[in-house]
UniProtKB/Swiss-Prot annotation:
Its EC number is 3.6.1.10. InterPro entries: ASMase/PPN1_MPP, EndopolyPtase_N1, Metallo-depent_PP-like. Residues 577-586 have a biased composition (Acidic residues). It comes from Yarrowia lipolytica (strain CLIB 122 / E 150). Catalyzes the hydrolysis of inorganic polyphosphate (polyP) chains of many hundreds of phosphate residues into shorter lengths. One of its GO terms (molecular function) is endopolyphosphatase activity. The chain crosses the membrane at residues 2-22. The gene is PPN1. The keyword rRNA-binding does not apply. This is Endopolyphosphatase. It catalyses: [phosphate](n+1) + n H2O = (n+1) phosphate + n H(+).
């Protein structure tokens, strides 16, 4: 059983050491991976400068060897293997029952249809068998377990809901998230034999993980798929229980409300942020963009800003990770644009971003100004869409109906072709912000374990030169920063206050006519303060706020059910701010309106002034900085590791794949196979020949790949571009040849 909380770690000592010129790290009592100059014998692991990105495992307990792709590699529920003990058991069952053609195979001869093998069915819409998941973890254990520093795991740990004979239930969702999480726990829990002395053996739930593991929520990890509410909810609490060892204790409160968090993988130096991309996802009907404070996506971006700003102050660097990649076909327009700005305006600390979901291997060049321009030009109205509305709506429809995430191979090929067109529109160096191309950011999309093509894994390598010296010689005295729990509590409090302010403004604006009518009916000779509309407004707001229950529904995620709720309402309903930094424009407008009201008490003009006051307050509120948008990049800072080679700059990655077509044949013949992941390509080799993976290198590669669209008359360049594009397409579909398919891979 997995522990339900992280409190069992309280007795662990701080573990870490820098020795022999190598950085060593392990967990402390707070569950953080830390470094130290103290020579300890517990849980020591050298930092290798590598990490694993794994995504979209999709284990399917109903996967059946010998089944066909059109049945999602499932057999009929009344089928029994024991009756027909044959490797191709479904085919035997069909023959024995006289059902040569399946009733939903549309007249196709079942015996001639390709059958699922032991490790899966490539180039199909089938999920992966349990045998593939087990073989994948075995290979990781035997080959890279001791060579990586952390794991970014970008979700989708459950089969698709694509077969109404086997409907997914909520307990299935949690069950397989638990199973996949347990695989990581078993493999990376401290083991005395492999990881050194200091513990009583491996496998005990009280022993910590030896490296950080950072999972993200996938669109198939929720019930129903794609649909995810703002928390706290049963689902968010259950996922927190399953991921309790992955989510730092100080952030569990935030996770229960938004299912996003971060881990410091090298404390004080490097972190990984796990985004909940379902709040940005077009196919999530419970999310409506990132423009309103009541949108969970808006709050998510505000949280992201708080975390990035704090990390900038601490001198840290950070990777962003998530399930759904930031492309216009996937994201709500406002979320797409705002995230692009966050990626570029924090270019001093963001090292890169990695995603899954699409099962194909490619990268996205993000240019926020281009995105903004395209959105504003669409039908002449900002925010209505990027490029074609029709295309967006079709994409959403395909996403909802097609079993393979967004679309099948033929659609993905068309998508990749559109990516090339996007590459062709990237401007040359003369129009870049600087020589580092720092007005761009790169989102990396990794292929998946699920064998829609071939199962894949990606191992990144990053620069750790000088890291040992930095850790071994900390500044004197070391800087002191607030605890993350304090930072995040302040975020919740400030966000609740912002929403309270907006409630006041909107209430006043909606009721200003009523207030004016009551004011007109009043006696001009009465005491100046008696039944003053200003006072009536204050009392009405207090009454309205008092009726809000922040512990349930949407408001629970906004206000967080925090203990400071009463103090927050006190501040919000007071006519004077309780602190000097209270920046509500409405208070200032109230003061002005009150003075105008006194001067014009006996005339309508003065009362009209009060009516205008509400409008001014609303306008002033809108005029405040949108916290879901980043501030401008400080002029005194330089671009960071993503742009200029330095500590933590990505050096390259190795893409691995497993040719399960070959391994399926071996298993069918002998009942065993030499299953393995082998190198498909590395970014250091031809034709990329990257020395490091800076943004400029990716932008230049994209421009070469897009050359055919822009310079049709330059035959030599076109030829070079086409040759490179063929390599790119082959890698996009993991060497399966899917780019040459003429028909969709399933109906």
């Amino acid at each position: 059983m997995l522990p339900k909380t992280l409190t069992i770690w309280a007795s662990l000592a701080s573990l870490a050491v820098a020795q022999s010129g190598q950085v060593v790290f392990a967990k402390n009592a707070d569950g953080k991976f830390v470094h130290s100059t103290d020579d300890l014998d517990q849980g020591q692991r050298k930092i290798r400068g590598k990490f694993l990105h794994i995504t979209d495992i999709h284990p399917d307990p109903y996967f059946h060897v010998g089944a066909v792709a059109e049945d999602k590699c499932h057999v009929d529920p009344d089928h029994k293997d024991s009756d027909y003990p044959d490797e191709d058991s479904e085919l035997v069952w069909f023959r024995a029952t006289g059902k040569k053609k399946h009733n939903h195979h549309k007249g196709k001869d079942h015996e001639k249809m390709p059958k699922a093998g032991y490790y899966g069915h490539p180039l199909s819409s089938c999920d992966g068998p349990i045998s593939l998941m087990n073989a994948t973890f075995d290979w990781i254990d035997q080959n890279i377990r001791d060579e990586i520093d952390f794991i970014i795991w970008t979700g989708d740990n459950v089969r698709h809901d694509n077969d109404n004979r086997y409907p997914r239930l909520e307990q299935d969702i949690f069950g397989y998230n638990q199973i996949v999480s347990s695989k990581f726990h078993e493999l990376f829990r401290y083991n005395e034999t492999r990881d050194g002395e200091g513990h009583n053996g491996g496998g005990d739930p009280q022993h910590p993980l030896v490296i950080p593991i950072i999972p993200s929520l996938g669109n198939n990890d929720v019930f129903p798929h794609n649909l995810y509410l703002a928390g706290p909810s049963f689902q968010s609490r259950r996922m927190l229980q399953i991921w309790s060892e992955f989510v730092p204790e100080a952030q569990q409160h935030i996770f229960s409300r938004g299912s996003y968090y971060f881990q410091e993988v090298i404390t004080g130096k490097l972190a990984v942020i796990s985004l909940n991309t379902l709040y940005f996802y077009k196919s999530n009907p419970m999310s409506d963009g990132c423009d309103e404070k009541t949108d969970p996506g808006y709050k998510h971006l505000v949280w992201l800003g708080v975390v990035l700003d704090e990390m900038r102050q601490r001198g840290m660097k950070v990777w962003l990770s998530g399930h759904v990649p930031p492309v216009e076909k996937n994201y709500e327009d406002s979320c797409h644009l705002k995230l692009a700005y966050w990626l570029t305006e924090y270019r001093d600390i963001i090292v890169g971003s990695v995603f899954g979901h699409m099962n194909i291997d490619h990268f996205v060049v993000m240019d926020p100004k281009k995105i903004e321009k395209a959105q504003s030009q669409d039908l002449g109205t900002p925010g209505l869409g990027y490029k074609s509305h029709v295309t967006d709506f079709l994409d959403v429809a395909i996403s909802a109906s097609h079993p393979v995430h967004t679309f099948g191979s033929i659609y993905k090929r068309n998508y990749i072709e559109s990516v090339r067109e996007d590459y062709s529109e990237i401007p040359g160096p003369k129009k870049w912000l600087d020589e580092y191309a720092s007005n761009f950011a790169i989102a990396h999309v990794s292929p998946s374990v699920i064998p829609n093509y071939f199962p894949s894994l990606r191992v990144w390598e990053y620069n750790i030169t000088g890291l040992g010296e930095e850790i071994g010689n900390p500044p004197h005295p070391p800087p002191s920063f607030r605890a993350w729990s304090d930072v995040l509590e302040e975020f919740e409090r400030d966000y609740a206050q912002d929403v309270m302010d907006e409630i006041e403004v909107e209430w006043f604006d909606a009721n200003s006519d009523v207030i004016e009518a009551e004011d007109n009916d009043g006696d001009d000779d009465e005491d100046e303060n008696e039944d003053d509309p200003e006072m009536l407004t204050e009392e009405a707001i207090k009454e309205g706020v008092a009726n809000i229950n922040p512990e349930t529904g949407t408001l629970a995620s906004i206000f967080g059910g925090l203990k400071f709720w009463k103090s927050s309402t006190a501040v919000a309903t007071s006519s004077e701010p309780e602190s000097d930094d209270y920046d509500s424009d409405l208070d200032a407008e109230r003061k002005k309106g009150k003075k105008k009201g006194k001067k014009g008490k006996k005339g309508k003009k003065g009362k009209k002034g009060k009516k205008k006051k509400g409008k001014k307050g609303k306008k002033g509120k809108k005029g405040k900085r949108d916290k879901s948008m980043p501030p401008k990049f400080p002029k005194d800072l330089q671009p960071g590791p993503a742009y200029i080679p330095q500590l933590f700059t990505p050096i390259g990655y190795t893409q691995y794949y497993a040719n399960i077509t070959q391994f399926n044949k071996e298993y069918k013949k002998t009942g065993a196979s030499n299953f393995e992941y082998v190198v498909e390509y590395t970014t250091n080799d031809a034709p990329y020949n990257f020395e490091h993976l800076t943004v400029r290198n990716w932008v230049e590669l994209a421009r070469v790949l897009g050359k055919n669209f822009r310079d049709l008359d330059l035959e030599a360049e076109k030829s070079k571009s086409d040759q490179l594009w063929k390599v790119y397409m082959d890698r996009a579909f993991v060497g399966t040849g899917a780019e040459y398919l003429e028909e969709p891979d399933d109906d």
